Amino acid sequence: MNKDIRWKQRFSNFNKALNQLQKFIDKGELSELEAQGLVKAFEYTYELAWNTIKDFLEFSGQSDIYGSRDAIRKGFQLGLITDGDGWMDMLKSRNQTSHTYNEDTARQINNAVVTRYYGLFIRLRTKFEQLSNNDQ
């Protein structure tokens, strides 16, 4: 039955993406190509994160969630995420990765992923693990 719950399916994919991101972070110093890989892993992880939030909110009866900004705001209001400003900064970084490529910007985003965003993803994973365990 749990396999039919969309947010849990999405959460499983989020975990896989987060594990991939962790490999880049654990590596430490990255080559230019690896740094580009970290940005891609961040993009995938971010997309799966906000979509997991959206799916969970819809599963819980919430509506009017049209994009990541709505999902983040509502997720913060309901305690799914604790650092709303951090998630909004992450949204801004995600938008920058898809609309521009600039080495300095990429370096700044890589630094933010390692020092800030990865921790936010870990907290989100912990929250959804708790919610998933409460369901069983």
Located regions from the model:
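Solvent-exposed interaction patches of small proteins and small membrane subunits
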Residues: 1-136
